[in-house]
Amino acid sequence: MTALDLSSPVAVVGTGTMGQGIAQVALVAGHPVRLYDAVDGRAREAADAIGARLDRLVEKDRLTGAGRDAARARLVPAGTLGELADCALVVEAVVERLDVKQELFRALEDVVGDDCLLATNTSSLSVTAVGGALRVPGRFVGLHFFNPAPLLPLVEVVSGFATDPASATRAYETARAWGKTPVACADTPGFVVNRVARPFYAEAFAAYEARAADPATVDAVLRESGGFRMGAFELTDLIGQDVNESVTHSVWQSFFQDVRFTPSLAQRRLVESARLGRKSGRGWYDYGDGAERPGPHTAAPAGAPAYVVAEGDLGPAAELVALIREAGVEVRPEHGYGAGRLVLPGGGTLCLTDGELPVSKDLVHFDLALDYRAATRIALSASRGVRPGLLAEATGLFQALGKKVSVIGDVPGMIVARTVARIIDLAFDAVATGVATPEDVDTAMRLGVNYPLGPFAWSRRLGATWARDLLSHVHEWEPSGRCAPSLALHRHADAAEAREDTDS
């Protein structure tokens, strides 16, 4: 099954920001496009707005003047649904209400031809439920674009329970012909991106609720150590706290209140107080005129130790040994058993967090980094009874490497490590339940939410057992089940261990 021919008209119903964006994508690809909105005059206003954006593309040399004029000629506002009768594809982008969408598609089914592909851009509703209102649900598919649709490349092509594979393939190939990167996925709450991404927000909010760190510090650690483009607090302020919380609540409810997707009470209170983020002028941060954004907590300068003893294999943090040497600090290697560690001159131990709490007074944990060489900030954590001077020694060591240091509360798994481990876990669970392929999950998370690595690529870098082991330890300290490793992750780690036993 191939993509729609460019001569085939495409209709977009709903002319808000997303509807306009989808219409622009189809228009620039070369299709005749019909715009329809239930509110009189909105389709014409949307056509004018799209025309203005085409003008800006010409100004930026991304579209020729002739291309703009041809595109404008192909864009037609429709006054009634009947004017969409000859369309080969109708994409719906109306309000996220099941009854409204079902009513619309029932009406469309009475208008369009039998071979017309019907698609919903829903981000939170069941594609199966929306399509269940149709007499012929086989031609119904989800086409989930990401906002802004003309700029973001990802499109999730969602097959409902009754979607004909040929319909899904045609939608997939059409999205690709439009210059997008489609990923195929089954109809599951949150599809790929909004399902696998929940821990990015949840673990940040959990650290805040546990008083381990404030929003500015969590955001800085996620950006400067984790390699994420934005922290969870600033990102949800950009998305809109009401929108983000609604998606989380929808996924949680759709999974029958699965504890892994439990919403944040702190975020709920933010929404209830109308602190919705940038659009309301205040969310986690204040965006009012003259407001100063708080900076992250950063440790005061401390002296570097003269040497460290490196025992065993530091695993994902092994690069630190070379960095310490390059900083002029002597490294004394020693053979060790079990997890690697750095022993400081005062006798204290510095370890990469493994999901345990640093209960010993002689132990400091440091957080995971995407790339320890490139990281500009490292989080440290110790018990409240840590031996005096040990945190200063650990801080001085990382400062000698050119890193800012944020000391956070003693939460198991800290910030980056716990977030990455949970994302990896949900990715394995999604693949095991037939939602998407590992390759498509990685593509979706990189392109849909700008993660520096896909979950499976991250798992390969960190080791097959890393996420399972860390989450198992976190679960021992927090036995609610939210961080318990999935069966899929257990199987993956167990298989890797079995291969190692066979090879040894």
Task: Indicate where each model-derived feature is located.
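Rossmann-fold NAD(P)-binding glycine/threonine-rich loop
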Residues: 103-154, 159-173, 342-391
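A short helix-to-beta-strand connector/capping loop
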Residues: 63-76, 138-139, 180, 361, ...
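NAD(P)-dependent Rossmann-like dehydrogenase/reductase catalytic/cofactor-binding core
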Residues: 2-4, 29-31, 180-183, 187, ...
